[in-house]
């Protein structure tokens, strides 16, 4: 993986963390920093804040029952995109982080569809991610993506624990 791919994957992870939990507009700060030239000094406090958010989530759910699923935001669709790319021998496939970024946008769409989020969230995230240089276009159709989601090994009794976005800084886990 080249440095560009690593930076994009890290950018997706940072933004994802602040979509999950954000009390100090770290999401907005991250957008501003990630959209410009690489500035490690400006990014470092945000990376530290994101690590604290993730550690707090993991520590609050040592038995991996519900809250610990929250950092999987975007992964259900992201893994489906990766599976689809592999199954279709896609040349130059998205990296894991890039697929998760697109998965977050799709999770926002699903959140809107189920009235968990207000309309416009997915479009906002798509514009934000694009602004930061992340890929935002799905490599497959919606139907192909849904078929790939059904391949997810984490499905219990045909249902998945899915992380939905209520708004930036607030998510919820529901079985679908």
For every predicted segment, state its role:
Residues 13, 83, 105-113:
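Short glycine/serine- and small hydrophobic-enriched flexible loop segments
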Residues 73, 77-81:
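Active-site His/Glu-centered metal-binding helix of metallohydrolases
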Residues 60-62, 85, 174:
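Catalytic, metal-anchored helix/loop core of enzyme active sites in primary metabolism
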